[in-house]
Amino acid sequence: MPSANFRLARRGLLFVISSPSGAGKSTIARRILAEDDEIHLSVSVTTRPKRPGEVDGVDYHFVDVPTFKKMVAENQLLEWAHVFDNRYGTPRAPVEEMLHKGQDVLFDIDWQGAQQLWQQASGDTIRVYILPPSFEELERRLRGRGTDSEEVIQKRMARAASEISHWDGYDYVLINDDMDECVKQVKNILTVERIKRRRQIGLIGFTRKLLAPPED
């Protein structure tokens, strides 16, 4: 009889969290990673300058533009996008390795990256979009970070409406008016998606064994 710790083999999933800047996707992603040891962050490649406190290979893989273009040309990226004068992309090899090992991969990316990822791996990709409760609250959060200039804040606000217009391309859409509640909802989505039948690749073998005639 299976023990309380019995688990079937399953295929990993690609779990995307997107939002306009300031709506909370990065904070939610950090909370999920800290509280769930079965999911791992996809570390993006970027051409943007490293910010204080960021670690190469942990927060991002920081590269120059020629290196990034070479990675695109050689199909080393699952998805990539040009955002605020910088390029961002997802290295293909580590993601595919984790997926085949049954490990989940978390993506903190925008709608362009989510769309490309879906086009390449629709059966493995789950997309969650985080909305702010209002544009006023979105601006308040951006200013509260204290990391962006007035010019950058205005650019982010101007881009927010365009980004939000793509909400209907996602599987789940949440309004982040309470961070703890929003994190709870995201964790619930993750739990449900993990136990869907198509992900339980060990079910066929298990049921065959379960239904096999008992040996004499």
Swiss-Prot record:
Protein family (similarity comment): Belongs to the guanylate kinase family.
Q: Name one GO molecular function term.
A: guanylate kinase activity
The role this protein plays is:
Essential for recycling GMP and indirectly, cGMP.
Question: PANTHER family, per this entry?
Answer: GUANYLATE KINASE, GUANYLATE KINASE-RELATED
- Identify the NCBIfam families for this entry: guanyl_kin
GO cellular component entries: cytosol
Q: What is its EC number?
A: 2.7.4.8
The record's subcellular location field reads:
Cytoplasm
Ranked from the top, the taxonomy reads: Bacteria, Pseudomonadati, Pseudomonadota, Alphaproteobacteria, Sphingomonadales
Q: Which SUPFAM superfamilies match?
A: P-loop containing nucleoside triphosphate hydrolases
Keywords from UniProt, A to Z, are:
ATP-binding, Cytoplasm, Kinase, Nucleotide-binding, Transferase
Q: What is its main location?
A: cytoplasm
List where this protein forms a coiled coil. none
Residue ranges occupied by any Guanylate kinase-like domain in the UniProt entry: 12-191
Catalysed transformations (reactions): GMP + ATP = GDP + ADP
| Protein name in the entry | Guanylate kinase
Q: Which residues bind ATP?
A: S19, P20, S21, G22, A23, G24, K25, S26
Q: Quote the gene name from the UniProt entry.
A: gmk
Under the heading Pfam families, the entry gives: Guanylate_kin (PF00625)
Q: Which domain of life is it from?
A: Bacteria
Concerning InterPro entries, the annotation shows: GK/Ca_channel_bsu (IPR008145), Guanylate_kin-like_dom (IPR008144), Guanylate_kinase (IPR017665), Guanylate_kinase_CS (IPR020590), P-loop_NTPase (IPR027417)
